[in-house]
C-alpha cells in the first residue's frame, strides 16, 4: 500500500469527486442508453445496526421474500455497511423497473439475489490479492449460494451476472438476469438510463434506500482497490482513476503492453 499524507488523500478525494466518480466507466455505461437491455483494503466501514425487515415492494417492484432471498439479505447486511447495502438494493429495484416496463420475463429471485450480492468484492473480507473485484464478488456469492443449496446452474448464472456487471456491452447481450444487474448498478452509479424512471418513482426508491454518502464511499473503494492491488485493475475501467490520482501508479497502459510485447513489430 502506498503511503500518502492525510492532506494528499483529502485533495485526491476532492479531485475525483469534482470530476465525477463515473469518469472511469463513462465509455462502458454509455451503452445503457443504447443497448438492450486477501490484501487489506485502505478503508473498511463498519456495518451499523439496521432493521431486519424490508418493505414488501418499492415503487411497485416486489421484494422477494423467499428463504434464499432473506438469507442473501442477511449475508449482505452482515458484510457491508449501510451505504453499500442500499446501493445493491437500488440496483435490484432500478433493474426491475427498466425491465418490467419492457415486459421482459425473468427469474426475479435470481436477479434479486445477484443484485444483493453483486458488490461483495468491494468488501475487504472477500478480496483476494490478484482478482478483479467483480470476480472476487462472484466467487464469494457463488460459494454462499451453493452452501445454501441453490442449484449449480442458477449459482453459475449469478456468478456471470456479478462478474460481468461492469462490462455493460457484454452483459446487456446476455440473458435478462445477467443484464439487469449491470443495468441497475450502472443506473445507480452514474445515472445512465435515469430518464426512464419517473421522478415520483425515483423519490420512492431513494426514500426506501437512501444514497447518503454513496459517491464518497464509492470513490474511496475505487482508490482502495487501486492502491492495494493495482495490477488487478489492468485494463479495468477503474485504472484511469488510479493513474490520474495516485502518484507513481504502476499499472501500464494498453499501449505500454503492446510496445513491450516480445515481437519485432
Segments predicted by a language model, with ranges:
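C-terminal segment of N-terminal export signals and the immediately downstream linker at the start
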Residues: 31-65
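An active-site-proximal "capping" alpha-helix that borders the catalytic cofactor pocket
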Residues: 132-147
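Conserved N-terminal diphosphate/IPP-binding helix and adjacent helical/loop segment
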Residues: 58-73, 80-90
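N-terminal secretory signal peptides
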Residues: 1-12
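Divalent metal-dependent phosphate-bond-processing catalytic cores, especially two-metal-ion Mg2+/Mn2+ enzymes
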Residues: 21-29, 48-54, 79-85, 89-104, ...
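N-terminal export leaders
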Residues: 12-34
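Internal catalytic or translocation cores that form aromatic/hydrophobic pockets or channels
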Residues: 151-157
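His-Asp-centered metal-binding catalytic motifs of divalent-metal-dependent phosphohydrolases/nucleases
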Residues: 109-127, 137, 159-168
